[in-house]
């Protein structure tokens, strides 16, 4: 009986020793997680550090780009300002130092005045036709020819101040003479309309006077 008790105690002690973990197992188990955690922390720290450094480089690059763009914009504005100032000064010098040269404008303004001389209100067709031909031949054509080389209308404007009024007066006098002629016995409209010497002479003198004025003032 005593022998059996001793045997059971020995078996229990052996079993206890077998089930107890060894110091090597404890050390290996406890150190591996620590190493992994340390490695993970180190890797995470390096990644965060690298990530934090990369934006800094991009920010610096963006800052340089913004500064360069700002310098370019400033230089461009300065160049534009100088260009505009130069154009403005050149334009001002031209306006002050050079006479205006626009033959088309001169032509248009003279034609506007010539167009005011009308014979539409003349009742008789023969008289109206003859007057229109006289004005075209002795007034419009010579005036258009003489203003061909005139570029600045302001210099010759005074030559046309009385043209419209004088022409209308000449037309009225001719119409009056025509009516007096047709009122005579044995006269007719055609014959009376053929006496053109008086009105033609008046219109020709007007045209000659204007041409001389333009020639002496256009340059």
UniProtKB/Swiss-Prot annotation:
It holds the Pfam family Aegyptin_C. It comes from the Eukaryota. It is found in: Secreted. The keyword Signal applies. Residues 72-107 have a biased composition (Basic and acidic residues). Keywords: Immunity, Secreted, Signal. Salivary gland (at protein level). Residues 19-109 are annotated as: Disordered. Residues 1-19 form the signal peptide. Residues 30-43 have a biased composition (Low complexity). GO terms for cellular component: extracellular region. One of its GO terms (biological process) is immune system process. Induces expression of IL4 in host skin by diverting host CD4 cells away from Th1 and towards Th2 responsiveness. Induces expression of IL10 in host skin. Down-regulates expression of IL12B, IFN-gamma (IFNG) and TNF-alpha (TNF) in host skin. This is Salivary IL-4-inducing protein.
């Amino acid at each position: 009986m005593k022998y059996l008790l001793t045997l059971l105690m020995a078996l229990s002690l052996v079993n206890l020793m077998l089930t107890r973990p060894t110091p090597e197992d404890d050390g290996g188990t406890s150190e591996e997680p620590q190493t992994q955690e340390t490695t993970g922390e180190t890797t995470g720290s390096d990644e965060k550090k690298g990530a934090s450094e990369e934006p800094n480089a991009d920010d610096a690059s963006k800052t340089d780009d913004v500064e360069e763009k700002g310098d370019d914009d400033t230089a461009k504005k300065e160049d534009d300002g100088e260009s505009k100032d130069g154009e403005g000064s050149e334009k001002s010098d031209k306006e002050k130092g050079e006479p205006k040269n626009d033959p088309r404008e001169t032509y248009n303004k003279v034609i506007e005045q010539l167009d005011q001389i009308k014979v539409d209100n003349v009742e008789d067709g023969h008289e109206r036709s003859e007057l229109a031909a006289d004005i075209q031949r002795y007034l419009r054509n010579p005036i258009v020819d003489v203003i061909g080389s005139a570029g600045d209308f302001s210099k010759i404007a005074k030559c046309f101040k009385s043209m419209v009024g004088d022409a209308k007066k000449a037309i009225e006098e001719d119409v009056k003479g025509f009516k007096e002629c047709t009122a005579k016995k044995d006269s007719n409209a055609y014959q009376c309309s053929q006496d053109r010497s008086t009105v033609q002479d008046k219109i020709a003198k007007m045209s000659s006077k204007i041409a001389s004025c333009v020639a002496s003032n256009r340059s």
